[in-house]
Regions:
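Catalytic cores of Mg2+-dependent Asp-rich isoprenoid enzymes
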Residues: 1-190, 196-312
Length: 312
């Protein structure tokens, strides 16, 4: 499974390798399961109702309510539709992921089941709203967007915090309650950055995440700027989260998405709101990775790097 994890996300594999062993295993498995459900939800060559049914069935397998062999055949159909061989290999090996889940301690297993249940709920909503790519559909309200970012990403901050305090005695200088709140905001901020970054591509596929009620009363540039400001506020909560971690290795693994997110916000701020997809160049990601390794040694240095990356 290590080889599969490395193949589907080299950057995530690199950062996760820095985590202490008690955190590495449940985080790795949760990532693989979430990546698999995301792949199922996004397999456009399979009709949305079939994707929705299979996603729900697999969620029941994760929850321990259904045997894996009852959905092995539909999953093979999904695997066959993957153009990316690494995604295909992941789907083909989900039985091993479920076996791995069964071998974990009960607390970690229950937390993985809980966070995957929340993530799948968000993915189901996405399929129900945007299942037909020939029809352009928008989220209606800011509450719907806030809910979506929590379901598919904010909940991960809660999951990460529970694992940290359970396995690492001195996980953070803040209380579990404070860290949970910051962690949820961090996850929501990362997802909001993705939405703003991918807005043009999503619109071409019939998905509009910026609230229709806001677009009806303000120019798109203003709505975009407002949500970009919210993303910056949330990602700043993320760097507060990371700076509160007491172990530099955990700080490094946790902070990298915030640092790349900070640079993405700077690029989005400078771009036209209707521009094509904005992405931090690979060379720049490597520079951020190198800089974050040193900056993670000190919370102050980490904050300084973050401020430099997010600056206009």
């Amino acid at each position: 499974m290590k080889a599969i994890l490395r193949s589907v996300s080299r950057s995530f594999y690199l950062t996760i390798s820095f985590l202490p062993k008690p955190l590495r295993e449940p985080v790795s498995l949760a990532y693989l399961l979430a990546r698999a459900t995301d792949t199922m939800a996004d397999t456009a060559t399979i009709r949305a109702p079939i994707r929705l049914t299979t996603l729900r069935d697999f969620a029941r397998v994760i929850a321990g309510e259904r045997e894996f062999n009852t959905i092995a055949s539909p999953l093979q159909n999904f695997a066959a539709q993957q153009s990316d061989r690494h995604e295909r290999t992941l789907i083909e090996n989900l039985g091993e992921c479920i076996d791995w889940l069964a071998k974990l301690g009960s607390a970690d297993r229950n937390d993985i089941r809980s966070v995957l249940g929340t993530i799948v709920t968000g993915q189901e909503l996405d399929l129900q709203r945007f299942g037909d790519p020939t029809v352009v559909t928008s989220l209606r309200t800011s509450a719907e967007l806030e809910e979506y970012t929590y379901l598919v990403a904010g909940c991960v901050g809660d999951f990460w915090t529970k694992l940290g305090f359970r396995h690492i005695g001195t996980f953070a200088s803040r209380s579990p309650e404070e860290m949970t709140k910051l962690g949820i905001e961090y996850g929501k901020g990362l997802q909001l950055i993705n939405i703003l970054r991918d807005r043009a591509a999503d619109a071409a596929a019939g998905r509009r995440y910026l609230p229709a009620e806001e677009l009806a009363t303000a120019p798109v540039a203003q709505v975009f700027a407002n949500w970009l400001a919210k993303a910056e506020e949330a990602i700043t909560a993320g760097i507060d989260y990371c700076s509160s971690l007491t172990n530099w290795r955990i700080r490094f693994a946790t902070a990298l998405p915030a640092l790349i997110g900070a640079r993405t916000i700077a690029l989005l701020r400078a771009a036209d709101p209707v521009a094509e997809r904005i992405k931090v160049p690979r060379k720049e990601v490597r520079r951020i990775l190198a800089a974050s390794g040193l900056a993670s040694m000190s919370p102050l240095a980490l904050r300084t790097l973050f401020q430099r990356l997010i600056a206009p």
